[in-house]
Design a protein with these regions (language model features):
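Acidic/histidine-rich alpha-helical segments that form the ligand environment
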Residues: 74-114, 124-134
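Short, contiguous alpha-helical
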Residues: 8-12, 19, 27-74, 115-159
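Short secondary-structure junctions
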Residues: 22-26, 107
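Basic/polar N-terminal segments that are highly enriched at the extreme N-terminus
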Residues: 1-5
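Amphipathic alpha-helical packing segments from all-alpha helical-bundle domains
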Residues: 16-20, 96
Length: 159
């Protein structure tokens, strides 16, 4: 199995776990502001940065057609702006998943990250990106468990 095959498998596995968390999130939790960042915001943040860092460099990033700049971080929403629905976030996750194979296949794993603030090569960027997915997926799984013992199954690898 090649390194790129392993990377693609781990992207798909981590995003499959994120998808489970999103799908299992009760509607009452989706917009819940008892946490600093509502569930939907953490899920969207995770997906946009996964998508972003799959690109060769910042200038090559093509945002999702529904992208809203203010949603990618954790700053307050612009007045009157509605959050993304669960269906919209899942739509974006699928777009990201659909691009994993082509984006990873095109990588020069020995090349620079492509992002000046990340001083390592493309191979390490893939680990960094997958760890980011799992950090926030774990955060969302913890919320689900605390809310009502809702469990997300472990996905070790995905074809």
């Amino acid at each position: 199995m090649s390194v790129k095959s392993v990377i693609k498998s781990q992207y798909r596995a981590s995003l499959a776990m994120l998808r489970q968390a999103i799908e299992k999130c009760p509607e009452s939790m989706w917009l819940d502001t008892s946490y600093r960042n509502p569930f939907w915001r953490v899920a969207y943040h995770t997906i946009i940065y996964t998508h972003f860092y799959l690109h060769p460099k910042e200038a090559d990033f093509v945002p999702w057609k529904k992208h809203i700049d203010e949603f990618q971080g954790f700053n307050p929403l612009p007045e009157g702006q509605q959050p993304f629905t669960k269906a919209e976030v899942l739509e974006y996750l699928e777009l990201c998943l659909d691009q994993v194979d082509d984006k990873v296949d095109a990588l020069d794993l020995e090349g620079e990250s492509g992002f000046y603030w990340l001083p390592f090569n493309k191979l390490e960027l893939q680990f960094y990106n997958i760890r980011h997915v799992m950090q926030h997926t774990g955060e969302l799984c913890e919320r689900l468990g605390a809310h009502g013992e809702i469990e997300v199954g472990w996905v070790g690898m995905a074809k």
